[in-house]
Amino acid sequence: MNKKENKISKEIKINKKSARRNYSNQTGITLIALVVTIVVLLILAGVSLNAIFSENGIIKRAKDAQNKMDQATQNDLDAINDLSNWIDSKTNGNTGDGSTGGNTTGGNDKPSTTPKISTLVGTVVDKNTKAEDAYGNKITIPKGFKVLAHGTEAGSATYTYSGDNIPAVQDGIVIENGTDGNQFVWVPVGTIKNKDNTTNTITLGRYEFDSNTGALTSTTPAQVASVENCTQTVTIDGKFQELSSFRPGNTATDSTAQNATARNLEEFISTTLANGGYYIARFEASENKTTNKIESKYNQTVAGKTQQNAVKAAREMYGEVKENNKLVYASDLVNSYAWDTTIIFIQTYSGTSNYASLNKSTSFAKSGINNDKYCNIWDMSGNAFEWTTEYSTHSLDSFFYPCVTRGGYYRTDDGNAYRCTSSRLFNGNVTILAHGPLGLRPLLYVK
């Protein structure tokens, strides 16, 4: 190989080395750029995903916007419907659901679509029906019952609160079963709206009363009714409790003695709070000898039973009326929540603020005959002692008295009235005392 060829060969080798160095450098730069690009893309992707899927992301905002649009549309439809009902009530005298309409009181100009109680008087409803009085106070009429009209005959329902004989919750609205004629009175709980734009609050609960005078010792219940606390044991006057679990009771007189308790205390409380009230029998119970069921009717002989049988009879009066396996309404013996809260209702709206301390008995008489009618409810302050589902822990020597009666009574042996509406008295599980029968009063609660 000559000199010229050697020179060319060396140049070629040098160029190859240089090319390899340049290629390596370019490859390193490209890889770095690629890594940087990927990192940037990942960062941007994270930002983008966060912008899309985060709590305040695009999708969430879009959903919120759609929900707000849907709610605005529904509000518009509701407003149009209310306006239509209001116009219809002014032009045709009724609401869109076929019942007399009108505004509620208290400054609320939004028309109510709830039927007025006044339009349903005398009509047996074919389902549980919510209705309201002129002041916007709601009741629930059970299926198969009707609201009684104001009357002037003995034993009639009377409505005087509004001054026009139209039923108002403050009067004690009377319902009657369309088949058997049994009567009950609505006892409201919660906030009640009055005709002068004031309100009163009646709290469902067990209250304490002075054992000597019968007077209410505190407007705050000793046990406020709630589903959460109904299982708690709260003792009044050292011996009186309302047990939450059902038991049938027995007639024992020793330490095994038990009273019969409420059918389903939690259900009574939950339905009462949800509906804003419950029904208490208008009269002390009598007994139909043909059907062997108790009744709540005017001018009937008061039934005498043991506490255990009183609970059984009250439960079986209507049982648990159900449709599609869902409760419509149920009957039970009055419990201490119902008895005490009824006293509060009557003292608030009857004009007799000392009702808890009264006994109006002048004789032992048939149901509704004594002058003892307040808020359309008869004889709670007198006539017969009345069994409740309340429990007594009292014992004397070896005798136990697990049952509790309430109210005043008239003694047939000496012709005098004893005790008063709020009185609690422990008793054994007997049918009759030496001075008169032990009566009962059922209640209804509506789903």
Protein language model regions, located:
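N-terminal leader/signal peptides at the extreme start of proteins
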Residues: 1-27, 105
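N-terminal single-pass transmembrane signal-anchor helix
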Residues: 27-50
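GGW-centered surface loops in extracellular recognition modules
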Residues: 107-197, 331
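Aliphatic-rich helix starts adjacent to a transmembrane/signal segment
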Residues: 51-76
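Short aromatic-cysteine micro-motif
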Residues: 178-181, 209-379
